[in-house]
């Protein structure tokens, strides 16, 4: 019984991570309510690259980040952006997240695309 309860608790902890595993190649749309965030995460190996481009119908906060224990690293961190574009190359095997935050006073719609880049 105790093992079953522990297994259930561990499975519940994994659900938010599974739901956040986006970042698949192709187009995406996030409709955010006021103050909400959207996050697309993908695991990249060292040297793998991904191109991204997005636009929003209002200015949003945008960042690209990864976690190392309790520390969050931000290779890209921008406030008040209506659009963004770039190419990110992983420097380590890691799960990386692209995140958008709507303003607290209003919602936002973010549309864009992800494109994996094949290594030469």
How would you describe each model-predicted region?
Residues 20-120:
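Acidic, Ser/Thr/Pro
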């Amino acid at each position: 019984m105790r093992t079953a309860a522990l297994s259930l608790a561990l499975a519940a902890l994994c659900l938010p991570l599974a739901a956040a595993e986006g970042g698949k190649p192709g187009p995406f749309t996030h409709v955010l309510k006021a103050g909400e965030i959207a996050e697309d995460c993908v695991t990249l190996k060292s040297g793998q690259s991904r191109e991204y481009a997005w636009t929003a119908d209002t200015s949003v906060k945008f960042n690209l980040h990864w976690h190392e224990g309790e520390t969050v690293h931000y290779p890209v961190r921008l406030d008040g952006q209506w659009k963004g574009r770039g190419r990110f190359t992983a420097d380590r095997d890691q799960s990386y997240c692209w995140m958008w935050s709507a303003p607290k006073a209003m919602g936002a719609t973010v549309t864009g695309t992800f494109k994996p880049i094949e290594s030469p």
